[in-house]
Amino acid sequence: MLEISPWETLVKLLTDSLLNCTGTHEDVPHAKTFLRSLTTTYIASLAVATAVTVGTVCLAVLHLIYIHFYITHSSRRLHIVLLACTAPLVSLLALVAMYMPRVWFLSHLLSFLYFSFALWVIICLLLHIFDGHHALVTKMMQRLQYVEIATPPFCCLFPCLPKVRLEGKKIRWCELMVMQAPIVRLFATLVSLVIYFEYQDQGLVPLKVLDFITLPSLLAGIYGTHILVTTVSRMDELISYRYVVVFRLLDFFFMVFGLQQPVFDFLARYGAFGCGTVLPAIETSFYWKNFFTVIEAFCVTLISTVLLQPSKSSFFDKHPSCRSMSSARSTITDVDTDESTT
């Protein structure tokens, strides 16, 4: 048996596999063939994933009903609808990929594209809360002095990053960092689809190279989002909206989703899933990755249902509890004003 160097092992893990699966499932079956040859484990996992996705969609419909009836501003309503659709859309795409193994790549690309778009939406929602970029910068310069740049994803590598003096152009640069991420991701998605449909499995290396090239764009978008949210989170205006809760849910979901793909890919090439029984090794790993994505989407939807109830967030300004809180705050303000004048 020939021994290979650690470098050769790493190259094989990135571009090929350590398994010798000749004579087994080399081609990904069509959905009809796949569904006819399911084992008990696959049947049970598909049943669970379908039920969980139905639950996620039902909760999402409930969210959309509350958003429609209890949010006044149409543009704010649109932003929140787009964010509320993240988990159910990702769950549905993952479920479709479980039933149709050949579309796993398309499912992953579309989900990743939507996550990148959601980063920009969360910043647009922040700007809307403060009535635009100029109003946000004005309030920040009145109450804050520095911009927090020691934030993920670079704070772990550079924990001693200094605070930067707050300026309007720096906030604009952060916004542009976030905005470029979905644009670059859209271009990368289109190029990836061309490579995949043209070269199939032979396009693996170009796809990995493309992911590596576009990684700085994604990291810049995430970094810009974290800088803005971390800096603005110190302002009292955001507390009643629970905006930071919305951001943390999206951020954590995106992080887990993004890390799962390379982890499951590495495990499959290392041999953790064997040669596969119904599907090839790589597709078997992505099948289970999609299963976990469905579960994660449900957890995110359920947590958001509990933490972002209309009675707890000022986003739902037409909800009775929110109106009563607003009237109470205005009464306190009037009393303070009267006392100051006397």
From Swiss-Prot:
The keyword Transcription does not apply. Its main location: membrane. One of its GO terms (molecular function) is transmembrane transporter activity. Keywords: Cell membrane, Glycoprotein, Membrane, Transmembrane, Transmembrane helix, Transport. It holds the Pfam family Solute_trans_a. The chain crosses the membrane at residues 51-71, 80-100, 110-130, 177-197, 209-229, 244-264, 291-311. It is found in: Cell membrane. Glycans are attached at N20. Residues 1-50, 101-109, 198-208, 265-290 are extracellular. The keyword Zinc does not apply. InterPro entries: Ostalpha/TMEM184C. Residues 72-79, 131-176, 230-243, 312-342 are cytoplasmic. It comes from the Eukaryota. One of its GO terms (cellular component) is plasma membrane. It is a multi-pass membrane protein. SMART domains: Solute_trans_a. Belongs to the OST-alpha family. Probable transporter. PANTHER family: ORGANIC SOLUTE TRANSPORTER-RELATED. This is Organic solute transporter alpha-like protein 2. It comes from Caenorhabditis elegans.
